[in-house]
Regions:
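A short, solvent-exposed loop/turn motif at the edges and junctions
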Residues: 14-33
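Extracellular beta-sheet/turn segments enriched in Thr/Pro/Gly and aliphatic residues
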Residues: 32-54
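Short, surface-exposed beta-strand/beta-hairpin micro-motifs centered on an aromatic residue
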Residues: 2-9
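Beta-propeller fold detector
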Residues: 117, 158-175, 224-248, 321-325, ...
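The canonical Cys-X-X-Cys-His
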Residues: 83-94
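Short, conserved, GDST-rich strand-edge loop motifs in beta-rich repeat architectures
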Residues: 96-103, 198, 205-209, 215, ...
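Signature of short aromatic-glycine-proline-rich micro-motifs recurring in repeat-based ectodomains
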Residues: 134-147, 175-200, 209-211, 240-269, ...
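Gly/Gly-Pro-rich "capping" loops immediately C-terminal to redox-active cysteine motifs
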Residues: 94-120
Length: 371
């Protein structure tokens, strides 16, 4: 009734606390430690523009105009903006995306600045390929219009509501794990068939193109660790070879990505082992995948290349086992069958699977996979 509140289970550390809320301006930061009693005062935002600075990114992203029906006709715009491109990697609407960095301020128009911005870093080739190739340059048009309107003072048309009732008791913890140069594509902490597996346990991340230092987070004990994911063959290519197309506004000419494993997804099995879609070798498939092989799947549909394979990590021992595949892998999912079949996507013209029971018995991927 006195308006006091408790932040529970904080690790013993030094903290900075301040008040942030919808309709408020951030208060001054105050140093504190667990056990301290503080009197933090909220500051009502002096205007709508100040209040909007802490709105969720989606409120700002909603201001982005959509192309016309005629512009959309030849392309799959939303798929590439949302699922396959921009939204998949960037939180469109947060401060650094709804504004243009000072490094790109020397252009005559924001349209030119966005063209230059998307050439930045080791991802520049891919970003330009999507924006200028797949989407025929439309993102440049609408992103530049969006940032122009934001720069001119336009604000989101709706405002988030302040929490009420039990929602005021929700405590959210946002954790930085891995390194500033890396990113996480995905993480897993359980077997989706039985979510009690690894209960209250560690979370395992897949850093994809960025690094081979795979992060591990223990949210119960507030600790993070990592392990190095090796590859089987020395000639496995690395993303470090990907050039910096143009200097980044944040990293300059530095090549911050350096991954051979290029792990896309993790998934735990019933025993708590972590299976990764991860590269273990160069693209060229072994002979038993190709035409002339006696492998049953190769006799039906031989394959010559595989851009990513499989690996399994044993948390207790730290053992990392390679699983070669004749098909590319992307996402993975266990079946509810006696073989604990691990199905994968990303195989292009084929769908691949691994009989994990047979692989555990033999250690031989050639006899345990099919497609």
């Amino acid at each position: 009734d006195a308006g006091r509140y408790l932040i529970p289970d904080l690790p013993d550390a030094d903290y900075e606390l301040w008040v942030r809320g919808y309709g408020l301006a951030d208060s001054a930061k105050t140093a504190a430690r667990p056990g301290d009693r503080l009197d933090l005062r909220a500051i009502v935002a002096p205007d709508a523009a100040t209040a909007a600075q802490v709105y969720p990114a989606a409120y700002w992203y909603s201001m982005l105009d959509l192309p016309s029906e005629a512009e959309l006709e030849p392309i799959n715009y939303l798929m590439w903006i949302k699922n396959m491109g921009c939204i998949g990697c960037h939180q469109l609407g947060q401060l650094s995306t709804r504004t243009l960095p000072a490094a790109f301020s020397g252009f005559e128009s924001s349209h030119e600045a966005w063209i230059r911005r998307m050439q930045s870093g080791q991802a520049g080739t891919n970003m330009v390929g999507i924006a200028a190739g797949q989407l025929l340059g439309l993102p440049y048009k609408y992103l530049s219009d969006w940032t122009d309107r934001v720069a001119a003072g336009e604000l989101p048309s709706s405002q988030p509501e302040r929490p009420s009732g039990l929602a005021r008791n929700v405590v959210l913890t946002v954790r930085d794990w891995s390194t500033p140069e890396a990113y996480l594509h995905d993480l897993s902490g359980t077997d989706r068939r039985d979510p009690t597996v690894n209960g209250y346990g560690k979370l395992y991340g897949s850093p994809e193109l960025s690094t081979d230092i795979f992060p591990i987070l223990d949210p119960q004990n507030n600790t993070s660790s990592s392990f190095f994911a090796p590859v089987r063959d020395a000639d496995t290519p690395s993303t470090f070879e990907d050039p910096v197309v143009m200097p980044s506004a944040y990293w300059g000419d530095e090549r911050i990505w350096n991954s051979k494993a290029n792990s896309h997804n993790p998934m735990l099995d019933a025993t708590g082992r972590v299976w990764f879609t991860a590269r273990i070798r160069a693209d060229q498939n072994p002979d038993w995948c190709m035409e002339g092989s006696t492998h049953p799947s190769a006799q039906v549909f031989p394959t010559s290349r595989s851009g990513r394979q499989l690996a399994v990590y044993e948390p207790d021992s730290g053992e990392y086992t390679f699983v070669d595949t004749c098909f590319g892998t992307h996402h993975l999912q266990f079946a509810e069958d006696e073989n604990n079949t691990l199905w994968t996507s990303g195989g292009g013209p084929v769908v691949g699977w691994l009989n994990t029971r047979l692989f555990d018995e033999t250690g031989d991927a050639e006899v345990a996979i099919g497609w």
